[in-house]
Structures are given as C-alpha cells and as structure tokens.
C-alpha cells in the first residue's frame, strides 16, 4: 500500500473512531448525569486529571519509545529494537508499582485533597481506585502499542478503539440498569476497556512485529537512560500543557464548589473532543515522518509536513465553526437541566487555544522524530507558567 493510500486509510479510520466516540459520549453523558447527578459526574473528569498527574512519571521513558524502536526496525537493527522493547516493558512494570503507591495514598486520603461530600466519598474513592488500576495496566502494556505505529497501520488502533468504546458503553449501561446507579461503575468499565485494548495490542505485536521478542535478558539500563535523557523534555512539555489547561477542574473544586466543577466538566466535552480529533489526526502523520527520517528521505519528509499542515488547517477549523454557530442550541438539547448559555461560553473559551495552534500541531511531531525536544518544551512550560 502506498504512503498516500495508507495515510488516507488511517485518517478515515481515525475520523470514524472519533465520530463514534462523540456519538457515544453524546448519549452516554446525559444518561450518567441523569442517574448520578451533575456534581458526581464532575468527579469523573477530576479523577482522570489526578491519574494524568500521577502518570507524568511514565512520560520521560515512553515518549520516545516508538521512535527508537521504529528507527531500528527500518535500519534492520532488530537486536537493538528488541533491547529497547524489553527495556521499556520492564521499566514500565517498575513504574507501575510507583503508580500503585501514589494511587493508594490519593485514594486513602482523598477527602484531604478535594472537596467531596461524605455521601459521595465511598463511591469517589472506588472511582479513583479503578481509574488508577486502568492507568497501571495501560502503563505496563503501552510498549505493545508500538507495533501499529512501526508498520504505519494506525487504522488497527482506530478499529480497536471503536470496539473498546462500545464495550465500555455496554458495561456502563448494563451496570446502571441491573444495579443501583453508582459512580464507580465508570471506573469498572474503564478497566474492562483497557484490558481489551491490552489483549489486542499483544496480538498486533505478534502479527506485525514477529521479529520483536520480549525477554528479560534483552533489558539494558543504557537503553533506559537514553530514552529518559531525551524523553524528559516531553515530561516538561506535558507539565506545561497541564499548567495551560489541566488544573481547571481541581481549582474549581477547591476554590468554588463541586457543582461548578461539574458544570465546567460538561462544558469541556466539546473542546476535549475537538482536541481529541486534532491529536488523533496529528498522530496519523507521525509514523510516516519517523519512517522517512529513518530512511534518510528528507525531501519527502518536508513535502509530507507541508501536506499535513494543510490537512490540519481544515480539520481544526470545521468543528470550531460548528460549535460557534450551533453550540448554544446543542447544549440546550444535550443537557436540558444545565444552563446552556454558561456551557456555551465556557466551551468557546476552551476552544481559543485550538483556533491558533490546531493547524500547526503536526509540526510538533518533528521534535520527537529528530529527538530534539528541549526548545519546544521550554516554550510550552513558559506559556503554562504565564
């Protein structure tokens, strides 16, 4: 399959994935709010944020794993590819133990970190516990996601995501229908979803990368050090992103109240979905960039970047325009029990950054491809501090 055709297939699958994800969210969110209330619903986003804060410790190791493994595969250096693969897996297993410790502390002392009523505390604790378990499983298994990246078959990831999202939705509906509605059912469904993804990723690895074998004898601390020394700048980049948009729910919970946090969480649904579309589309270009760089085809790489920027400009602007025109009416229909005017204005504020940065997002992949993340990371973290 040619590069253009492969990219088209990957992009179509990615767009289909997000269309289905948004449809599921469109019907599932009101269902959840109706059953557990807007206050309780806000804790879902907050719990996910806490997990993302804790998972920062994994970024330095994993940010460049796909890059190093893919480049070694296309340079026919399978011994090194195996060393990177095994080193990442066993290092992630160790990091998962640290995540388990962090998660345990947060769950046990949860009411000291956030404002939560006594009635909701047991449910919120279980929600946090299951979402941390989700994160731990995802961390251990993340290296198996390299297979579809290395072979530029990201459409397989998209199909897997569609199946996993449908499975998650079914779990939530079944649990809410058969038992008394509880907040932590969301966490149970997430664990089922990540286990399904793990199984498929292992299958894809065996099918697409038969040369790659997991072995403790292939673990090399030198490989870990090399990955971390470059990936640490991705950690700073992620910290900058959190400072930019990842603390809003926590700040709202601590300084205002849980109800306001719930409203803000709902208003972030569409901006988050648009960001997801942008991120998913950007990720489609990354394997091709990495493969062309590994093969030394710099002119083709430059043409690919220019083409990607044109595509991103279109994909970014269309959903933002739709939100501006139809957003207020959409929220009035989607969440009739919540002030649609407030949701609309908060959503517009959440999309301001997307308008200016969406079209050039694909360029950020180049920093990872050439393993020169320092300059970009410094700019992002300074922006977050400002």
Model-derived regions, located:
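Membrane-interface junctions at transmembrane-helix termini in multi-pass inner-membrane proteins
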Residues: 4, 136-163, 173-174, 184, ...
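Alpha-helical transmembrane segments of multi-pass membrane transport and lipid-handling proteins
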Residues: 19, 89-115, 174, 199, ...
